[in-house]
Amino acid sequence: MAVPKRRTSKTRKNKRRTHFKISVPGMTECPNCGREYKLSHRVCKNCGSYNGEEVAAK
């Protein structure tokens, strides 16, 4: 069975983990009402529009 010869140092462990990070969500200003930021490809909570059309009644 494979066993590590030496203990992994904190520096080596942290260098390996540099890519494990949370990315910022893509927020855009609503083109219809312009008052609220919304996630991309989702309905605006303020005006209920998506892709220039009203899809959710307020």
Curated annotation (Swiss-Prot):
Belongs to the bacterial ribosomal protein bL32 family. Transmembrane segments: none annotated. Pfam families: Ribosomal_L32p. GO terms for molecular function: structural constituent of ribosome. Keywords: Ribonucleoprotein, Ribosomal protein. The keyword Ribosomal protein applies. It comes from the Bacteria. Gene3D superfamilies: Single helix bin. The keyword Ribonucleoprotein applies. NCBIfam families: rpmF_bact. HAMAP family: Ribosomal_bL32. One of its GO terms (biological process) is translation. PANTHER family: 50S RIBOSOMAL PROTEIN L32 (PTHR35534), LARGE RIBOSOMAL SUBUNIT PROTEIN BL32 (PTHR35534:SF2). InterPro entries: Ribosomal_bL32 (IPR002677), Ribosomal_bL32_bact (IPR044957), Ribosomal_zn-bd (IPR011332). This is Large ribosomal subunit protein bL32. GO terms for cellular component: large ribosomal subunit.
